[in-house]
Amino acid sequence: NHQLTQENERLTQK
């Protein structure tokens, strides 16, 4: 379950 990681990556990219 790396959904949080993916969301965090998106936020970090922003």
Curated annotation (Swiss-Prot):
Q: Which family does it belong to?
A: Belongs to the M protein family.
Q: What does this protein do?
A: This protein is one of the different antigenic serotypes of protein M. Protein M is closely associated with virulence of the bacterium and can render the organism resistant to phagocytosis.
GO terms, biological process: phagocytosis
Recite the UniProt keywords alphabetically. Cell wall, Peptidoglycan-anchor, Phagocytosis, Secreted, Virulence
Q: Know the name of this protein? A: M protein, serotype 32
Major localisation = secreted
Source domain of life is Bacteria
The subcellular localization recorded is: Secreted, Cell wall
What membrane topology does the UniProt entry give? Peptidoglycan-anchor
Q: Which GO terms describe its cellular component?
A: extracellular region
